[in-house]
Structure formats: structure tokens, C-alpha cells
Amino acid sequence: MSAPVTPTKPPTPAAPTTPAPKPAEPASAFGAYLDYGPRGVARIALLSQWLGGAQLRVAHTYLPGDRWSNIEGPPGFLDVWADWRRERKDRMLVLNVPMMERNEENVSDAEVRMLLRQGAAGAFDQHFRALAQRLVELEVPDTVIVLGWEMNGITYTHRCGPDPEAWKTYWNRIVTTMRSVPGQKFRFDFAPSRGRDAVPWTQCYPGDDTVDIVGMDSYDQPRGLSFDEEVNEPYGLQEHVDFAKAHGKPISYPEWGLFRNGDNAAYMKRMLAWMDEHKPLYNTLTDYCPHGVWQCRQNPRASQVYRSVLFGRTDPTPQPTTPVPTPVTPVPTPVPTPVPTPVPTPVPTPVPTPVPTPVPTPVVPPNCSPLDLGEWVEYWLGGKLCMRFDWWSRTR
């Protein structure tokens, strides 16, 4: 830092500071579930093109829930997703992680209850430790983990209903295990389905210490339900927002889209407006039939709404504020000292160098030998002299 300079005159009072532009609110990242494998990654750029170059900052995939070896992250499965995530710092990888194997095999409530209690006792810790280690090795330690999603329903083996207390203990154990892996920065997303379903999702909430995001899967169902009813129903969209705010958590919508009410443009318009208003950390549309709008051609009206709203969307930039003019203290303008006009130095006209007239080479007569008398003598004589060979001839 330079030394301070003592002013030579009293300092001018500081002018009022122009207000800085209001910082933009954090952008709500969005994307879509396009496929669970490499095709899902490849389609992100194509969907972006369809949306006029909109920035899709979220990639979303699911680990298979058939067996524990796949829940650990099978070799090669996550590599292409990790590659995409690492290409830009502002991207996000969202990974749905089942809490049980045989996750969609209609396991009975009694068996689910037994499995939840085993998990709560630590029987499955090693599988989640292995997954965390794999994600850290792939250099995606900040992956969003949507763990045990839609736990308030009846679809999955990792459902909460058969034993909510064991379920919450098991969730906490999984999170603690994954957080114990060095280098991790995971964010855990608690994402029930909208509405009461089989059990109120608030009964499954495992506590603020092990939840980073409060998500919600919100499809346009059941049939005949208006969007206002989806907002205001018990455990609906409004209660979700209020619950997250009360617990100091950001919200998300890992799954959403059309469903029981078909090609419902009104739902699409209202859901997009809802997310613009409440600014989730991220949202990912489920883009396959009957839910989607790009890969599913049976929803043209909703597709047009989705595309028109998100076309060309990028992160917001700060809005310029009206500049406040800064008062300027007038400073007297000094009178400049006249500077004499310089007189140009005359440039002499160059004298052309005379080119001497070429002197024709004299023709030496026959029977004659030139005499070398030197250049100066030859100059005054007008050339070389020649002595004839026959000057002594007898006939002369």
C-alpha cells in the first residue's frame, strides 16, 4: 500500500455515494430427468437447444434399487454424470438413492418394518459408505442426495408408513455414515410426494440436523384436482413451503409434471409461476410420458407453455438502478500560456546529380596499338593515341 500524501489544500467534502445496484436473487436451477444412463446426459444439450439455449444447470438420475451392489453406485454408471457435473462450477448433480434393495418388488409391510429396524441398527451402513466413497472419488462430493424419496406413499420398499420411528432412525444413520467419509459435501433432500398419501409426510421428517433441503414430488394428480387445490390441500404445496421456511431449509421439486389430468396447460403455467415465486434451489421435470413435454408428444399444449416460459432463460443479472448524479465542485480553468507557433525549417531543394554523358568507346583502327598515357592526359587529348604498326614501312 502506498504511503499517504499530505494534501496541499483543504480536502473537498466527499460526494454522496451512488447506491450500488441491488444484487440479483440466486437463480433457481432447473433441468429435467431425461434418462437414467448416458443418454440422459447427452439429451441435456438437446433439450437446451429446444429451449433456445436456456441454461440447464441440473442433471438428475437414479441409482437402481434392485440390489445393494447397484445402490453402492455400480462401476461406470456414475462416471458420465460426474464428467458433466465437473465441466462447470455452477452445475448440480441430483441423485436419487434408494434406502433398500428390492425397492419396487411389492414387499409386505411386515417385511418392510423388519428391514427398517435392521437398517436403524446399522445392518446396511457399508453400502452407503461405499456410495459416498465412490462419489468423492469421482470428484462430485457436493451431489444432492434425494434419499428414500416419496417415503409417505406405498410404492417403494423404503417407505416410512410401516414404522416411522425406525425409518427416521435409519435415515439419520445413513446420513451420518455418508457424512463420515472424508471430502464429502453432500446435501440431503427429504422429498415426499405432495398430499397426505399413505401417511402424513411430516411424521417421517427425520430432523433438521440430517436434512439440508425439503423437497416435494408434485405431479398433476388426482384427476379433477385444480391447481389451487394442489396448493391448499393438507400437506400440499403451501404447507410444503411453510414447513421448509419454519425449519430454515430451501425447497426443491425433484419430480414434477403432468399426469392424471392429461395435457393440462393450466397446470403447467401455474406450476412454473409457483416455482418462479417461491424460488426452489432446483427443479427437474420428469420428461417421459405421461409426465413430460419434450420427449412425450401427447402433451402439445403444456409443451408449448413450458417452452415459451423457459425459452432462452439464463441466470438473472442485477437490474440497473437510476444513477444519482454526483455533485462536482467547480474548479477554475487555468489560462494557458501562449505557445509560439514553431517556424518550419526550410528544406533545401535537392540538386540533381549531373549524369555524365557517356563517352563512346573509340574504335581502334586496324594495324594500330593504343598508347596508355593516363586518364588526365587522355581527357585533354580527347581520347587515347594510337601508334600504327606500319609507320616504319620501306614504302613510306
Regions found by a protein language model. Give the residues of each.
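Composition-driven, intrinsically disordered low-complexity tracts enriched in small residues
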Residues: 1-19, 321-396
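Substrate-binding cleft of secreted/luminal carbohydrate-active enzymes
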Residues: 22-40, 249-327, 364-396
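N-terminal substrate-binding region of glycoside hydrolase catalytic domains
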Residues: 20-123, 258, 284
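Aromatic-lined carbohydrate-recognition surfaces of secreted/lumenal glycan-active proteins
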Residues: 148, 175-200, 248-262, 285-288
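Hydrophobic faces of well-ordered beta-strands that scaffold small-molecule active sites
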Residues: 30-32, 57-61, 91-97, 143-147, ...
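Alpha-helical scaffolding within the catalytic cores
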Residues: 39-48, 73-83, 128-131, 194-206, ...
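Glycoside hydrolase catalytic-domain groove-lining segments
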Residues: 76-92, 96-98, 204-261, 303-305, ...
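Substrate-binding cleft of extracellular glycoside hydrolase catalytic domains
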Residues: 70-186
